[in-house]
Each structure stands twice: as C-alpha cells, then as structure tokens.
Amino acid sequence: MSLRFTKMHGLGNDFVVIDAIRQSVDLTPEQVRRLADRHFGIGCDQLLVVEEATRPDVDFRYRIFNADGGEVEQCGNGARCFVRFVHEQGLTAKRRIRVETRSGIIAPQLEDDGLVTVDMGVPVLEPARVPFVSDSDAIVQPLDVGGETVAITAVSMGNPHAVQVVADVDAAPVAAQGALIERHPRFPARVNAGFVQVVDAHRIRLRVFERGAGETLACGTGACAAVVTVILRELAQSPVRVETRGGELDIAWEGPGQPVLMTGPAVTVFAGEIDVD
C-alpha cells in the first residue's frame, strides 16, 4: 500500500499527518510503529489522521496515534498542525474549524500572524474523570513514585496529565520518574507526566514525559495542564507563556469551568509517499 503523508511539527513535537479523506487508510498498530520509527520509517512522536466528520456540526474527525501504535484521545500541538494541514491541502477554506476527537470537540483557528489558536475545552479536574484513583478532590495530591512521595495535580485536557511543580526543570528526573508515573496504577489509562518550574506570575518552564512516546520537545495538552495547575495553586496568573525545549506557547485560562486557549506555531516540513506493507 502506497501512502501519501506530510511531516509537520509544533515546537519540535513532530507528526506524520495522513489525509484519509482522499486516500484509503487502514493502519495496524504495527504499521503505525514502523512509520513512527526514526531509523526504519519516517519518524514522529505521533501520527495524525484526517478523516471525514461523523456528525453534522463539525468539519473533520481527528485521530491520534502515539509512536507505540496506541490510539489516544488528544494532542494539542497536533491540533495546531491539523488545522494548518487541512487548510494548506485545500480540504477547507475556513480558518476556524470544529474538529471531533475521541475526547470531544476542539476548535483550532489560523491567526493572521501565522500562529494557531486552539480552544482546548474545559479542563477536567474530578479525579474519577481524569481518570485518577483518589478519595480526595484536593488540587495537590500525594503520589508514591519509586518509594518517594511527590505532590501532583491530576488534570485531563482530553488526555490525562500528572503535573508536579519543581524548583529546576533542567534537574528534574523526567526520564526516571516520568516512566514510573506514566504507568502508575493510580492512573488506570496511563498518564502524561509534567514537570513545571514557575519563573514568574506569567511565565513557566515545562518538560513532559508523554504517554507512549517518552519525553518530547513540547506537549500542547501538557502545557495547558501545567498552566491550569499553577493557576489553581495560585503560583501564576493568566495569560501564561510556557517555555518548552522546542519553543514557546501562550496559554490563557480564566479559571474552573472556562476553556483553555492555546496559541503557538504549526510548521510543515516536507511531504512524501511511502510504501506500507
């Protein structure tokens, strides 16, 4: 099977984007893993699939597959690339679209300055809906990680995040703790592990160990979850600029019950065609 694709990135968080509207696409988890392999495939953190909408009130369906082949609910950096892709490919003339994901509706918009703003929806804080096993609704929760107790905030941005505040994000044990937190039994759907350093009231630094992908250069939903965390803990105020290893995102959130707005770049790198067997 020959497959046309486009390679894109949002702050170095890179994607293989596939149009499943104008070509037939039915990938197995093993095929996704091969495409995502940086030595034997194209290479990416996630593979994004553009499909026709299944309901009349949205423009497209957006599916996300991690590099390990598993399908996940949401990807913020990918959402920015998604709207740029469908616009550049002539699949829509709209600059603002409504997109269905496994976790609900998002609304990305191409801005005049070339950046993309995405309404990421209202963050979920109730532990059972994250999902996170806890008998408390406290914002800060203790979590045993390899015999050490760390303080985390559990947030879902359509996908689950465990965010901890650290003094120095460069020295944070992202690889060691991130792998343990990702598969912690209190997160039955696994989780993305965020490590955030507060610089001042409107700036934070962030690293994220992503579920199914490991540490990436940037994580859009992770940035949203981190901003929700520091605002809830009264360590920062909206809007917040988030520094990642791949670049910066601007996040605005006015508090519980309100949607999170994320603004950042989306870049097309190259397009190609690959044989998938």
From Swiss-Prot:
Keyword Isomerase among record annotations: yes
Alphabetical list of Gene3D superfamilies matching this protein: Diaminopimelate Epimerase, Chain A, domain 1
Site features described as Could be important to modulate the pK values of the two catalytic cysteine residues, chain residue numbers: 161, 210
GO cellular component: cytosol
Compartments (UniProt record): Cytoplasm
InterPro entries given in the database record: DAP_epimerase_AS, DAP_epimerase_DapF
Binding sites annotated in the UniProt record for substrate: 13, 46, 66, 76-77, 159, 192, 210-211, 220-221
Species of provenance: Aromatoleum aromaticum (strain DSM 19018 / LMG 30748 / EbN1) (Azoarcus sp. (strain EbN1))
Pathway: Amino-acid biosynthesis; L-lysine biosynthesis via DAP pathway; DL-2,6-diaminopimelate from LL-2,6-diaminopimelate: step 1/1
PANTHER family for the chain: DIAMINOPIMELATE EPIMERASE, DIAMINOPIMELATE EPIMERASE, CHLOROPLASTIC
Domain of life: Bacteria
Designated name of the protein: Diaminopimelate epimerase
Role played: Catalyzes the stereoinversion of LL-2,6-diaminopimelate (L,L-DAP) to meso-diaminopimelate (meso-DAP), a precursor of L-lysine and an essential component of the bacterial peptidoglycan.
E.C. numbers: 5.1.1.7
Catalytic activity: (2S,6S)-2,6-diaminopimelate = meso-2,6-diaminopimelate
Family classification: Belongs to the diaminopimelate epimerase family.
Keyword line: Amino-acid biosynthesis, Cytoplasm, Isomerase, Lysine biosynthesis
Molecular functions (GO terms): diaminopimelate epimerase activity
Pfam families for the chain: DAP_epimerase (PF01678)
Residues of the active site: 75, 219
Subunit note: Homodimer.
Protein's GO biological process: lysine biosynthetic process via diaminopimelate
